[in-house]
């Protein structure tokens, strides 16, 4: 699963997920899966969607993951009283803003790419849409 090899600090503030997305264009492949909604994707969700796509295209073509879970999320153990410090890091998330391209694909027909992205989108908690590369 995706997570940083090392970080400057173990834990992070919660923060807010506002603002506009960076990386809104399909730049590596021909087809892409773009976020319409705002939210956060865990490393497990990113991997589940990648596996669904890979199986759908039967390992042909190439898939790029354009997001990386670099924010640690902490949780306290069950039945522990409030206080006594911040909890332990349990999983990693990627913050997603509307317009962000999540995955890209190349080397497969458009119908197959649409089907693969549809299966991947079912694994994700945010609303997404299918996009193609625009040549200028």
UniProtKB/Swiss-Prot annotation:
Residue stretches in coiled coil: none
GO CC entries: cytosolic large ribosomal subunit
SUPFAM superfamilies, per database record: Ribosomal protein L16p/L10e
BP GO terms, sorted: translation
Pfam families: Ribosomal_L16
Keyword Ribosomal protein recorded: yes
Record InterPro entries: Ribosomal_uL16, Ribosomal_uL16_bact-type, Ribosomal_uL16_CS, Ribosomal_uL16_dom, Ribosomal_uL16_sf
Signal peptide boundaries: none
GO function terms (MF aspect): rRNA binding; structural constituent of ribosome; tRNA binding
Keywords from the named record: Ribonucleoprotein, Ribosomal protein, RNA-binding, rRNA-binding, tRNA-binding
Function: Binds 23S rRNA and is also seen to make contacts with the A and possibly P site tRNAs.
Subunit structure, interactors included: Part of the 50S ribosomal subunit.
Family: Belongs to the universal ribosomal protein uL16 family.
Name of this protein: Large ribosomal subunit protein uL16
């Amino acid at each position: 699963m995706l997570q940083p090899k090392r970080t400057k600090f173990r834990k992070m503030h919660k923060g807010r997920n506002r603002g506009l997305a960076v990386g809104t264009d399909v730049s590596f492949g021909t087809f892409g899966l773009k976020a319409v909604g705002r939210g956060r994707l865990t490393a497990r969700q990113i991997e589940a969607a990648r596996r669904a796509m890979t199986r759908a295209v039967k390992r042909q073509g190439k898939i790029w993951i354009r997001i990386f879970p670099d924010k640690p999320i902490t949780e306290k153990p069950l039945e522990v009283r409030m206080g006594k410090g911040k909890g332990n890091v349990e999983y990693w998330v990627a913050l997603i803003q509307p317009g962000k391209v999540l995955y890209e694909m190349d080397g497969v027909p458009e119908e197959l790419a649409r089907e693969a992205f549809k299966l991947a989108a079912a694994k994700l908690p945010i609303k997404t849409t299918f996009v193609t590369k625009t040549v200028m």
